């Protein structure tokens, strides 16, 4: 049985020095339903270089969120090439994918989740502490300040508005300093001014 920590080290070593990029080549994804096989992604090709920010637009149900899941290794493509942070995800098993995401990818889902029994500060800091980051509280405070929530550190999710909760989720992703950040409608619950500030951060 493989050692997850050793695998994580090997993955990190193989990724280091590469262009922290996204590369999709002729990606297809089909799912089986009661109605038969449904094609979700058809021949998607996309290249994103390190330092670039790319927005994907399209109609509801067009596959945007699914493509993000494929890039993060949360969905397996039926065919094609999927490289994230310079690493071919098709060669990783599920345990290796989990380690890979932890070390390289930050995700803000459209339907994000905060732990209701933790404060805003704890929701950002605790995942960092689990990852062994020693300055987790300071980093969490800095990111919450960056999204305009420095006055809400001790508030629980139930005490925050929907937009404030979304900013906590964004701060949590920013604080991890991932090589690649994937965000699904990250400003959907924010007003124009706050949304613009968040886009500047991105």
Q: Language model features by range: what are they?
A:
Residues 1-30:
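ABC-family P-loop ATPase nucleotide-binding domain
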Residues 19-22, 26-202:
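ABC family nucleotide-binding domain
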